[in-house]
Amino acid sequence: MNELIKYKLELLPDSPGCYLHKDKHGTIIYVGKAKNLRNRVRSYFRGSHDTKTEMLVSEIEDFEFIVTGSNTEALLLEINLIQKNMPKYNIKLKDDKSYPFIKITNEPFPRLLITRQIKKQDGLYFGPYPDSYTANEVKKLLDRIFPFKKCKNPINKVCFYYHLGQCNAHSICQTDKAYWDGLVEDVKLFLTGKDDKIVTGLKEKMLAASQAMEFERAAEYRDLISGIATLRTKQRIMSKDLQDRDIFGYYVDKGWMCVQVFFVRQGKLIQRDVNMFPYYNEAEEDFLTYIGQFYLDQKHFLPKEVFIPDTIDQDLVQAVVPTKIVKPQRGEKKQLVALATKNARVSLQQKFDLLEKDLRKTKGAIDHLGQLLQIDRPYRIEAFDNSNIQGTSPVAAMVVFKDGKPSKKDYRKFKIKTVTGPDDYASMREVIFRRYSRVLKDKLEMPDLIIIDGGQGQVNVAKDVIENQLGLQIPIAGLQKNDRHQTHELLFGDPLEVVELPRNSEEFFLLHRIQDEVHRFAITFHRQVRSKNSFSSKLDGIEGLGPKRKQALLKHFKNMTAISQASVDEVRSLGIPEKVAQALLDSFNEV
């Protein structure tokens, strides 16, 4: 379990919702639901598990969560998220075939079926349902209420269900299309929650049966009404009108805004987008700017409707978003916007909590590092690394960390000027001297600790320059890597010794970050220099092509391939004479 997960586990709410486990690549590998997100997600990282769960846990590097309004919402959201992301550890539910739907066929005598394959041209589909049992329970209830054709028997042959009162295909004339159309509409209303008409009719039949002393029949109607009530649980995650819409919510705090967008397709929440950024104007104005830019990106599908919070000017949004804009005022639709807003608040609070915890731990790491090395608290740390390939294009780089955080405006790059060939010691000597003689000359801020990305030899060279050549007293430490190029040992002292540093300590993580950052910065600079040198060398020998013209070519064309494909006029446009331009292009043809 890494540090990020440890932080996030402390931030989980005691609310129902869904959680999404991610691997080291950021890929969603498992989607789950929970009545209590805090308890459920924490359980993955506590105690022992079976082999399958251990495999899952071993790959988890991060997780997200979405708060829902009820456990049922969490269940339905889980289904939709699995369909959308197809996580590998949800293998039994990884495609649409795994989810049952209720289908009304487009046949002249419609039938109610359960299917796992969707072919929209063949009928109407309702779902998905979480499992076959649930879908079958709903279908059984529908079969008892709506007398659709139950089998594929010829229409002139009476089936078993006709005698149960559950099939009218034999008794209804084949030409009575209006009857079947009406039955289909009743089912559509029923499955989208608009079942008042059906319940009223059943209550009337129950009362009539009771008055006629047909108590068994009355009990059947009573059970049907009870079954309908069970299915009446309202879902904010599932939109009953099956519309495509985007639902926006936002929350602001401490100068930051979080915008949360729920993407609802065919009435189901399939994905969300979370974006956090500092805002500089009124919150409502910056939100308008955000939503106006949101649909300029071709990646964002424009739905039939966009829901926005009631604090936003609807007309202004309508002016920049070419679809129907809705500010829900009541009921389920308003609750959907409230849910998006709630998740925006939770996400923003999580960001602040993580930042605060990270800051506390980083400051603690700096304190502990100072204590470990027996020096003053190293507020400003400057780290150095060399980079070259067999002595070609040698460079060095310096990064600065202030209070445990990178200060990129203080980063510096160095081209090695006095060293020929691959000599890391001499290169380090040059760079340290150039850096700190400049610090002395310009009276710049001195570091509290210098870190050398290297072993004993390079550290001793740096100490010699600092103490003997420049007369400074600055603590210097070295970071050695192992054969896998990973942070391995901290060297410090006089003489240098390995400082024992627990691999799971905050101090180790801080030093690891510093070493990775200075190495990245040095490597990037070396690649830039090597590329530029390679570019220039290929242009050497062309008469009339001096350094300034080479620089102009590099700036304009970026690479040799682009130059080789250019015309004489394009090259001349950079102020290069026609004769020189022609000679340049001819040199590529010769190759």
Swiss-Prot record:
Domain UVR residues, every copy: 196-231
Keywords assigned by UniProt, alphabetized: Cytoplasm, DNA damage, DNA excision, DNA repair, Excision nuclease, SOS response
Subcellular location: Cytoplasm
A GO term from the CC aspect: excinuclease repair complex
Gene Ontology MF: a single term: DNA binding
Annotated ranges, domain GIY-YIG: 14-91
Biological processes annotated in GO: nucleotide-excision repair; SOS response
Assembly and oligomerization: Interacts with UvrB in an incision complex.
Protein name in the entry: UvrABC system protein C
The species this protein was found in: Streptococcus uberis (strain ATCC BAA-854 / 0140J)
